């Protein structure tokens, strides 16, 4: 009974946390600033929910090795699974929000597409690779540069507003279009939004997500493999 209650609370938190932010942003941008985007609630949550997965994983990764210091010191195991498990857990929270997206689709007279069956796993795997690459870099470097968390928090907030989550990508002036072009997080969000709202797979965005994700993972694992032998003494 206790386990069931804990699972229920976990599910409620997975849904309530991003939904609360969605309500706040809806009030500010739709009701106050009157942003003219059709089906804005669906538009908002299809960008905000996957963003929450990335942002929570990246932020939590900063302390993933520090929080597991005793296990790292006393047990021999692939330590890279620690940030990976965090990414997977946040991904599970994201999957819990998909029923909420379905409900809002029906509210706005839209329906899920059959392409979700293969589209969700395809984009989700790309996001796992991308987010793991970022997480392994942050979790490793934060052991040696403890002030990194301040810069990461600032960077994530900056990237949130540079990514078309609250606004449509076509609202950006031509001279600032590079913000989307060179922002892999924009490709990630737009991939999800195209799938959920239009039932389409934008393979250009998905390819960018995979390409940058693989590069980040290779770089991250290289940094990790160079520094992992010093973990015990640092911790």
Predicted feature locations:
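Hydrophobic transmembrane alpha-helices and immediately adjacent juxtamembrane helices
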Residues: 1-235
């Amino acid at each position: 009974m206790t386990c069931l209650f804990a699972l229920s609370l976990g599910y409620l938190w997975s849904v309530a946390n991003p939904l609360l932010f969605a309500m706040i942003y809806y009030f500010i941008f739709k009701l106050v600033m009157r942003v003219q985007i059709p089906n804005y609630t669906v538009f908002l949550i299809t960008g905000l929910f996957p963003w929450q997965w990335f942002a929570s994983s990246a932020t939590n990764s900063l302390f993933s090795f520090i929080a597991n210091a005793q296990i790292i010191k006393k047990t021999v195991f692939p330590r890279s699974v620690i940030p990976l498990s965090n990414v997977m857990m946040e991904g599970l929270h994201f999957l819990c929000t998909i029923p909420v997206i379905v409900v809002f689709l029906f509210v706005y007279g839209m329906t899920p597409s059959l392409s979700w069956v293969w589209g969700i796993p395809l984009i989700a795997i790309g996001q796992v690779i991308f987010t793991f690459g970022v997480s392994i870099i942050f979790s490793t470097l934060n052991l040696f540069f403890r002030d990194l968390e301040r810069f990461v928090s600032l960077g994530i907030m900056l990237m949130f507003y540079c990514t078309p989550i609250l606004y449509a990508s076509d609202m950006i002036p031509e001279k600032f279009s590079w913000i989307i072009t060179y922002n892999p997080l924009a490709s990630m969000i737009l991939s999800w939004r195209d799938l959920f709202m239009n039932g389409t797979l934008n393979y250009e965005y998905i390819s960018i997500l995979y390409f940058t994700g693989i590069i980040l993972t290779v770089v991250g694992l290289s940094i990790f493999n160079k520094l992992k032998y010093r973990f015990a003494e640092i911790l």
